[in-house]
């Protein structure tokens, strides 16, 4: 018998001679199939069913020889089965014996006497055999009844065969899991169908019942409100009538004094006139007394209302969102200081210094060199301020002024004539806001259909939806809405849906053919985000299946030819965007600190350049906040020496109302500087921008599949991004772009385009989503740029380890449930495992807090010690996950107070977002059939549930520090962790990031035995042994004689 390695080499050699090719996985497949077959003909038939081999001639001989060479396990019969088989044979043998008939009584007596003793001896054995036979018959009847129930009365037996090997058992479990998965998917679809209200089907009985119920509730509420409304209306009427009567009385007295002032009146007329004057005076005194009482009431102390025993409610102080926590205290201090400071009036204006002067020293300025000019298509004109433009033009005039408006009819004709259309237009041409409106006006939303427009960023989806709703004159959330992760601002009437590309991907789960959409517009396609690339492949297939679906791919002036080729040579429709020329300036020498150079350049432009707003591109939230603080500090020190400079940040985690400030008109006499991430390159259009500052850097996420480590590093941007940034300056007038790097660096150090995100990120969520959609052949999926093989393989391995995929790569029931949760697969597994450990409420809180991207605590520079002490007060034994749970629990107990957040140095906006995430995840628990339960303070169960999801991320303490269990990579605990000084032996981490070191963030102390409990398929007991914990045997020393 050949060895496995030798057999595999033999199969590869034979495959090469028979088929002309050889591959290791094919050889292993053939050997495994031959081992599972019981005969050579069955093996040949299985190969023929695959439709990959022509089993005639040499191929058939090869299959027969392979079957004869493959070793097979001999079926070993269990002792209990052997004893049972012998008992059955003996029973059949006894039944074959018959007594012979004889007329002689003596012979009968002899036989009876001789056999009496033998019958007594065998009596017990016969009774035992009879009992065993009855039990076997009962077991066979029960097995047949179960088989009839499962197969609907068919003759197929569900009894496990005697010779069932490991492969057959695994196959049976796989088929059973597939049935459960399909049943779960059907239940989810049925629930969605029951909860979906179809406004077009007026005959729906359930809809009628719901409408009647709502009308009845409204009627009851109206009846309950009528008495109070009558009282309120009566009071308002009496007050109004009092004013009218008093005015009539005063007018009547004035007329009488004017007409009969010099006429002798009778005694009755004099008394009547005196009475009217008395009434008028009393009415005036009554009104004055009422006003005086109101004035005193405002300065009077009022006893607070009793609130004990009432449930705490969520309070959102919208008026305090405009700044950091403690904004109200800061405003009060500024008001008091302002009242105490000395101010000059017009009388002292002559004695003051000139209003403006040069505030930068010559050595502080940055020298720029004008290199090129981006040509525009309109003549320069005097740029009107935003306030003047808003006063002179209406919204419709602004729409008509956009570059896309002259091409409206041609664009609609091209959309009608082609199913897929590539639209090329620079940011600001109006393609994002106007094209969906044109389609709406053209009737593409008739018959209940909708139009989807995807955006790569949630900030862009929210701001664009608000702008379109304002232009259409509708309320946001009605006809126009947006849908982003953990926030849905749509309704049943929404026909224009702006959403992130990830949200449209999730809609494929419930509606794989996008039947409710007539047009799908993929905007900002040139950014090539992960979800955008996946959408390309899916929408391409859906478009072939639905000829009536219109697909629009909107991009800037990059990669349009490539998009056209991908979509089967789709036509390209070009829209001009830049309307004015842009001068580009480079520095003479490289800048060492580009953040400091940005601040200096902003002040230099503000002092030396004509009016016009400034746009600064930085890499992330930390740099933006630092730059804004530096600018505000320097402007505060300069005081009245410079004009007013409004510093406005814009990044993804900023609240919506603060994001909307960048779109507000700049006040007269001031200048606005917008400090933004690369979101302002293409996703947003800010009016009034004349100057652009480009340091030439951006943040990119990279992923190492070998270590599973992600890193968000600052890297030079591409030439395409630099050109996009420069184009922001030519929207309203001739602009200028100041690049804080040299022209040589632009030509030789910048890449042409940015690497697509799909080639530098983890693919766990994408693989799970595609598997949920029934796409199993991921290697041949129609990617615009295929991801690296190692990254895809690692994603499959992780999903298999989490139980989302079986050994054949098919989606399991757990995987189908995990796909319903809009979080990372490990986080989804943790939530599903919480049901087993009865701690789903605590796990939901932990999952929500982990989803806010490490932005819970903040450390003001002037209160670092206080912030660190406040953070330490939340520490609990066990790890950072329990710290996050403690923070949220105390915040909830405080009534979701913003003041509590300020006192404990916790970011209120992040906590409010965590609350929104938790509410959505709690609503999805019913969808994935997980019940709500609490551990009642037993945090061991919480830690075990977290381990069930993140057992892939474990590390243990060795003599050289922490190392990951599987990869043996050296890692470090983050200094902000609660376990930084404790150094436990076994750790679990949420993510591994590369900054200055390989840091583990959000670590949790675990026990090694838990890994065997939650993931016995992934860890072996030998891997979890501590080699340093073993004690070596004591050695007995030798004497001098023994040593020789």
Curated annotation (Swiss-Prot):
Compartments it resides in: Nucleus; Nucleus, Nucleoplasm; Cytoplasm
Region listing for Disordered, in residue ranges: 101-210, 374-394
Enzyme Commission (EC) number: 3.6.4.13
Modified residues (Phosphothreonine): 715
UniProt keyword annotations, A-Z: ATP-binding, Cytoplasm, Helicase, Hydrolase, Immunity, Innate immunity, mRNA processing, mRNA splicing, Nucleotide-binding, Nucleus, Phosphoprotein, Spliceosome
A Gene Ontology biological process term: innate immune response
Matching Gene3D superfamilies: 1.20.120.1080, P-loop containing nucleotide triphosphate hydrolases
Domain Helicase C-terminal: 601-774
Regions of compositional bias (Acidic residues) in chain numbering: 134-143
Similarity remark: Belongs to the DEAD box helicase family. DEAH subfamily. DDX16/PRP8 sub-subfamily.
Function: Required for pre-mRNA splicing as a component of the spliceosome. Contributes to pre-mRNA splicing after spliceosome formation and prior to the first transesterification reaction. As a component of the minor spliceosome, involved in the splicing of U12-type introns in pre-mRNAs. Also plays a role in innate antiviral response by acting as a pattern recognition receptor sensing splicing signals in viral RNA.
PANTHER family assigned: ATP-DEPENDENT RNA HELICASE, PRE-MRNA-SPLICING FACTOR ATP-DEPENDENT RNA HELICASE DHX16
Quaternary structure (record): Component of pre-catalytic spliceosome complexes. Component of the minor spliceosome, which splices U12-type introns. Interacts with GPKOW. Interacts with TRIM6. Interacts with RIGI.
Protein's name according to its UniProt entry: Pre-mRNA-splicing factor ATP-dependent RNA helicase DHX16
Source organism of the structure: Pan troglodytes
Protein's gene: DHX16
């Amino acid at each position: 018998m050949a060895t496995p390695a030798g057999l595999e080499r033999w199969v590869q050699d034979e495959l090469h001679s028979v088929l002309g090719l050889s591959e290791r996985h094919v050889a292993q497949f053939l050997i495994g199939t031959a081992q599972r077959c019981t005969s050579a003909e069955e093996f040949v038939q299985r190969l023929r069913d695959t439709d990959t081999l022509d089993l005639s001639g040499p191929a058939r001989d090869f299959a027969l020889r392979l079957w004869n060479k493959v070793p097979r396990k001999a079926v070993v019969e269990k002792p209990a089965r052997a004893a049972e088989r012998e008992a059955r044979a003996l029973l059949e043998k006894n039944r074959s014996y018959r007594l012979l008939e004889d007329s002689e009584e003596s012979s009968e007596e002899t036989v009876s006497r001789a056999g009496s003793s033998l019958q007594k001896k065998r009596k017990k054995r016969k009774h035992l055999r009879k009992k065993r036979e009855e039990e076997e018959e009962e077991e066979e009847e029960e097995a047949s009844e179960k088989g009839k129930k499962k197969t609907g009365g068919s003759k197929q037996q569900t009894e496990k065969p005697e010779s069932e090997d490991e492969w057959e058992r695994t196959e049976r479990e796989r088929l059973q899991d597939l049935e459960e998965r399909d049943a779960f998917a059907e239940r989810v679809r049925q629930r969605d169908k029951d909860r979906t209200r179809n406004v077009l089907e007026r005959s729906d009985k359930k809809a009628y019942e719901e409408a009647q119920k709502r009308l009845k509730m409204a009627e009851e509420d109206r009846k309950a409100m009528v008495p109070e409304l009558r009282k309120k209306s009566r009071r308002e009427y009496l007050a109004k009538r009092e004013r009218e009567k008093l005015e009539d009385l005063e007018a009547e007295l004035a007329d009488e004094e004017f007409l009969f002032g010099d006429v002798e009146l009778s005694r009755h007329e004099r008394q009547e006139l005196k009475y009217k004057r008395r009434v008028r005076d009393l009415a005036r005194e009554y009104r004055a007394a009422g006003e005086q009482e109101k004035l005193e009431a405002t300065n009077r102390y009022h006893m607070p209302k009793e609130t004990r025993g009432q449930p705490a409610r969520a309070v959102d102080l919208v008026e305090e969102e405009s700044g950091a926590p403690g904004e109200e205290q800061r405003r009060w201090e500024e008001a008091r200081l302002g009242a105490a400071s000395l101010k000059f009036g017009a009388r002292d204006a002559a004695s003051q210094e000139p209003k403006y002067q040069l505030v930068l020293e010559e050595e502080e300025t940055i020298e720029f060199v004008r290199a090129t000019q981006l040509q525009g298509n309109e003549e320069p004109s005097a740029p009107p301020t935003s306030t003047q433009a808003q006063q002179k033009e209406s919204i419709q005039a602004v729409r008509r002024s956009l570059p896309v408006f002259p091409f409206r009819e041609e664009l609609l004709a091209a959309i009608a004539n082609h199913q897929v259309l590539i639209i090329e237009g620079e940011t600001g041409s109006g393609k994002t806001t106007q094209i969906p409106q044109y389609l709406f006006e053209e009737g593409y939303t008739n018959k209940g259909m909708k139009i989807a427009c995807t955006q790569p960023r949630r900030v862009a989806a929210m701001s664009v939806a608000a702008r379109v709703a304002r232009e259409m004159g509708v309320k946001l959330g009605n006809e126009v809405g947006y849908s982003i992760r953990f926030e849905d601002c749509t309704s049943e009437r929404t026909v224009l849906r702006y959403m992130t590309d990830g949200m449209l991907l999730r809609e494929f789960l419930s509606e794989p053919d996008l039947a409710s959409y007539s047009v799908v517009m993929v905007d900002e396609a040139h950014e090539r985000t992960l979800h955008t690339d996946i959408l390309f492949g899916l929408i391409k297939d859906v478009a072939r299946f639905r000829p009536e679906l219109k697909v629009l791919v909107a991009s800037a002036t990059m990669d349009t030819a490539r998009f056209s080729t991908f979509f089967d040579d789709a036509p390209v429709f070009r829209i001009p965007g830049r309307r004015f020329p842009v001068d580009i300036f480079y520095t003479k020498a490289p800048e060492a600190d580009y953040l400091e150079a940005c601040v200096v350049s902003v002040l230099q432009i503000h002092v030396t350049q004509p009016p016009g707003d400034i746009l600064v591109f930085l890499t992330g939230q930390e740099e933006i906040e630092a730059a804004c603080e530096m600018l505000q500090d320097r402007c505060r020190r300069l005081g009245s020496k410079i004009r007013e400079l409004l510093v406005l940040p814009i990044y993804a985690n900023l609240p919506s109302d603060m994001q909307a400030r960048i779109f507000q008109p700049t006040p007269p006499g001031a200048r606005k500087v917008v400090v933004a991430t690369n979101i302002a390159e293409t996703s947003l259009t800010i009016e009034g921008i004349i100057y652009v500052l480009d340091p030439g850097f951006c943040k990119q996420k990279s992923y190492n599949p070998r270590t599973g480590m992600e890193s968000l590093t600052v890297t030079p941007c591409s030439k395409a991004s630099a050109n996009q940034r420069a184009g922001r300056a030519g929207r309203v007038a001739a602009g200028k772009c100041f690049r804080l790097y040299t022209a040589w660096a632009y030509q030789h150090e910048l890449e042409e385009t940015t690497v697509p995100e799909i080639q530098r990120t983890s693919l766990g969520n994408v693989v799970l989503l595609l598997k949920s959609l029934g796409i199993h052949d991921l290697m041949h999926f129609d990617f615009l740029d295929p991801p690296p093989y190692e990254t895809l393989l690692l994603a499959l391995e992780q999903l298999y380890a989490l139980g989302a995929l079986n050994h054949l790569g098919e989606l399991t029931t757990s995987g189908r449930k995990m796909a319903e949760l809009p979080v990372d697969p490990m986080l989804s597994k943790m939530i599903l495992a919480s049901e087993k450990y009865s701690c789903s409420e605590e796990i939901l809180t932990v999952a929500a807090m982990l989803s806010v991207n490490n932005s819970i605590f903040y450390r003001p520079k002037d209160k670092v010690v206080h912030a660190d002490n406040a953070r330490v007060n939340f520490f609990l034994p066990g790890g950072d996950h329990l710290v996050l749970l403690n923070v949220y629990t105390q915040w909830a107990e405080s009534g979701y107070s913003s003041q509590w957040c300020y006192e404990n140095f916790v970011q209120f906006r992040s906590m409010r977002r965590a609350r929104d995430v938790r509410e959505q995840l709690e609503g999805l628990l019913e969808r994935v059939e997980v019940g709500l339960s609490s551990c009642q303070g037993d945090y061991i169960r919480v830690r075990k549930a977290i381990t069930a999801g993140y057992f892939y991320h474990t590390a243990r303490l060795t003599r050289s520090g922490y190392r990951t269990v599987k990869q043996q990579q050296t890692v470090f605990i983050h200094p902000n962790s609660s376990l930084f000084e404790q150094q436990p032996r076994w750790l679990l981490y949420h993510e591994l990031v590369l900054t200055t070191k390989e840091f583990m963030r959000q670590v949790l102390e675990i026990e090694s035995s838990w890994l065997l409990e939650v993931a016995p398929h992934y860890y072996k007991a030998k891997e979890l042994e501590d080699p340093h914990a073993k004690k070596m045997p004591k050695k007995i020393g030798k004497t001098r004689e023994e040593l020789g």
